[in-house]
């Protein structure tokens, strides 16, 4: 198949996406597909051949890419674009996507995981992988997700609010501690703070203003961090995350050796079943499709507290879903190919 692996874009998770996309593209090419990596925002800038020739490029336009410890400089990315346009679709992106049999969406965060790209592809009749635009948009909104799933699964107490800089001190004064402060629509734990003091709450709220005016302030739950991938609507083995320092933030997620990841997780069968049930319930309630990954904190008594679900989980060398798939006997190349074939089937059957 001709496959465009769409990555990059203008999200704070740009670098993670490019790492995922590079690995996905190489895996699909190794399985005989004509796969090519395309940056959503920059498109085919710098490529001298005809757009349709990317599928025959010897390397699929895949360079060597690893995730830096620091978040990307998006201003520099914008400045590097030759036409200086803010259009999320770069040069020839829609053109080559329309030529493909399917687009593997390897985007993370805004302009990719939030449903906007999926909606555009639906309008243009371009087949793509993963959940549709509505489920993607809902899952990106942490507050809306929790409101929809709270009747069915256990989740930490939370409140969502929009605020200005002038309101930060008052909000900090009335916040129950300890708590977790996070942007309402970010991924990769970017902007997330565990706050134990009023000052830490205020600092976290100040930082979150860089990511939009809405935050979620969540009750801090002490427990073990477990995550569960899902493929074709069925949960994969749970994985436990044990950061060597701090919590599972951006740096700990994407730097090899920064966290211990144990899969299958060393937990009782009863815990595994509760996690499986909760993950599949959230997936079903939000009407997601093909694959995703849900995040939980499990307390000492075995209660799983649902945190959020990611419709386009990372596929980097340190990412969790590939590890969980491997524990279920599914290799990385097979996982990528199953996502493609399951997505095409789901769209044909009207399930995505």
Regions picked out by a protein language model, each given a short descriptive name:
Residues 196-277, 298-305:
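Phosphate-binding site of ATP-dependent enzymes
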Residues 50-55, 119, 247-255, 311:
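Short, flexible, mixed-charge acidic loops at enzyme active sites
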Residues 35, 127-128, 155, 179, ...:
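Hydrophobic beta-strand scaffold residues
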Residues 1, 6-10, 153, 268-352:
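ATP-dependent carboxylate activation and anion-phosphoryl transfer catalytic cores
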Residues 3-7, 11, 19, 90-97, ...:
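Active-site nucleotide/adenylate-binding loops and adjacent lid/helix of ATP-dependent enzymes
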Residues 1-134, 138-140, 144, 148, ...:
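ATP-binding N-terminal substructure of ATP-dependent carboxylate-amine bond-forming enzymes
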Residues 119-128, 197, 202, 327-329:
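A glycine- and small-aliphatic-rich helix-loop capping segment at beta-alpha/alpha-beta transitions
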């Amino acid at each position: 198949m001709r496959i465009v692996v769409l990555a990059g874009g203008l999200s704070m998770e740009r670098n993670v996406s490019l790492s995922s996309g590079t690995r996905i593209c190489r895996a699909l090419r190794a399985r005989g597909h004509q796969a090519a990596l395309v940056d959503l925002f920059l498109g085919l800038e710098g490529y001298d051949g005809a757009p349709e020739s990317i599928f025959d490029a010897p390397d699929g336009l895949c360079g060597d890419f690893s995730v830096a410890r620091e978040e990307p400089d998006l201003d520099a990315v914008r400045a590097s674009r030759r036409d200086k346009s803010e259009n999320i679709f770069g040069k020839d992106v829609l053109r080559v996507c329309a030529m493909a049999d399917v687009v593997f969406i390897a985007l993370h965060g805004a302009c990719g995981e939030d449903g906007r790209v999926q909606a555009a592809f639906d309008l243009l009749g371009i087949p793509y992988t993963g959940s549709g635009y509505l489920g993607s948009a809902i899952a990106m909104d942490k507050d809306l997700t929790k409101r929809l799933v709270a009747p069915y699964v256990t989740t930490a107490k939370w409140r969502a609010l929009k605020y200005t800089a002038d309101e930060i001190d008052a909000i900090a004064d009335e916040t129950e501690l300890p708590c977790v402060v996070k942007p309402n629509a970010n991924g990769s734990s970017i902007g997330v703070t565990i706050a134990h003091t009023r000052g830490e709450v205020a600092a976290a709220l100040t930082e979150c203003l860089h990511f939009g005016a809405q935050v979620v302030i969540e009750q801090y739950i002490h427990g073990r961090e477990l995550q569960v991938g899902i493929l074709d609507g069925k949960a994969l083995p749970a994985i436990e995350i044990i950061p060597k320092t701090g919590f599972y933030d951006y740096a700990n997620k994407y730097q090899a050796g920064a966290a211990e990841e144990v899969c299958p997780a060393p937990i009782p069968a009863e815990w595994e079943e509760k996690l499986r049930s909760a993950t599949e319930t959230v997936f079903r309630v939000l009407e997601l499709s093909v694959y995703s990954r849900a995040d939980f904190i499990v307390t000492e008594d075995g209660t799983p507290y649902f945190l959020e679900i990611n419709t386009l989980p990372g596929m980097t060398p340190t990412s969790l879903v590939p590890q969980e798939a491997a524990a279920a006997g599914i290799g990385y190349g097979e996982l990528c190919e199953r996502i493609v074939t399951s997505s095409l089937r789901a769209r044909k059957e009207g399930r995505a």
